[in-house]
């Protein structure tokens, strides 16, 4: 049985009065992580060798996820970088690249794969899980606006620049909710009940409205304190991820 599609998912993109200035404090989150016992594996469950594919956010590349990558490896998981390139292209193209990486990780480990996506990367992860649930052990989103894009005006301006570039390739609806590609239709689809979810958010998010980053379900939504940018290096987020992965084991298929 599938869970409901994201409630209130909006196809348009709207500005949100979020505190962008707070993102300048992201360095404090990184320092807090380094000072936290969770960063060194204290008080969290060990991994079982299952794969976890990390997906970067809008305009980002895999490289800023290396801190999270190393931490997961130290815990005993088998992390993979997404290999999608810069997250500033046609969503369907990015989704196909992500699928290739997930299939590689699935074949190497012989079991479904965890997906951990930051911001727009989490939306790509949810879309893939909805379309190919047999490949996915669980989905973790970190500040991902999967209920509709409500962002700071400067973020929407950057999105429009990407859209203009893609339009030159004769894809007028790309980077909008009106696109009917598999990536967008997958985001609108119901998430299968077989795929456990974790939605990490912060009410001090300076990039997106935190209200579009949650399922409105206390069983899946976890609030942390910090910035949007540094959700990939937030001690509260790391603790929630470790707890979620330990609970979300999927059996190895024959």
Segments from the language model and where they lie:
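Residue-level signal for well-ordered alpha-helical segments
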Residues: 29-35, 42-45, 49, 56, ...
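Helical cap/lid subdomain of alpha/beta-hydrolase-fold lipid enzymes
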Residues: 130-254
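Serine-dependent carboxylesterase/thioesterase catalytic core
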Residues: 51-63, 67, 73-188
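Generic, low-specificity signal for short hydrophobic/alpha-helical stretches with a mild N-terminal bias
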Residues: 6, 10-13, 37, 47-50, ...
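Flexible, membrane-associating and regulatory peripheral segments of lipid-active enzymes
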Residues: 1-53, 64-70, 75, 108, ...
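Generic structural signal for short, flexible, solvent-exposed coil/loop and linker residues
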Residues: 9, 19-22, 44-48, 54, ...
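Contiguous hydrophobic segments
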Residues: 16-37, 43, 117-133, 145, ...
């Amino acid at each position: 049985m599938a869970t409901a599609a994201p409630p209130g998912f909006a196809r348009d993109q709207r500005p949100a009065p979020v505190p962008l200035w707070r993102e300048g404090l992201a360095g404090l989150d990184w320092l807090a992580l380094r000072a936290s016992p969770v960063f060194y594996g204290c008080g969290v469950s060990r991994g079982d060798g299952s794969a976890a594919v990390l997906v970067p956010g809008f305009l980002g590349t895999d490289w800023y996820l290396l801190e999270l990558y190393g931490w997961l490896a130290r815990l005993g998981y088998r992390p993979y970088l997404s290999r999608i390139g810069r997250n500033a292209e046609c969503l369907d193209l990015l989704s196909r690249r992500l699928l290739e990486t997930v299939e590689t990780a699935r074949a190497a480990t012989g079991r479904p794969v965890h997906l951990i996506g930051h911001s727009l990367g989490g939306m790509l992860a949810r879309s893939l899980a909805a379309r190919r649930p047999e490949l996915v052990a669980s989905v973790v989103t970190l500040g991902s606006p999967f209920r509709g894009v409500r962002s700071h005006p400067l973020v929407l301006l950057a999105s429009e620049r990407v859209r203009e570039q893609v339009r030159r390739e004769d894809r007028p609806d790309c980077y909008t909710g009106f696109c009917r590609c598999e990536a967008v239709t997958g985001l609108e689809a119901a998430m299968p009940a077989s795929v456990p979810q974790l939605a990490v958010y912060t009410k001090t998010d300076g990039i997106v409205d935190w209200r579009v980053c949650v399922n409105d379900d206390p069983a899946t939504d976890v609030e942390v304190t910090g910035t949007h940018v540094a959700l990939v290096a937030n001690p509260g987020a790391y603790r929630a991820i470790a707890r979620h992965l330990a609970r979300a084991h999927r059996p190895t298929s024959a």
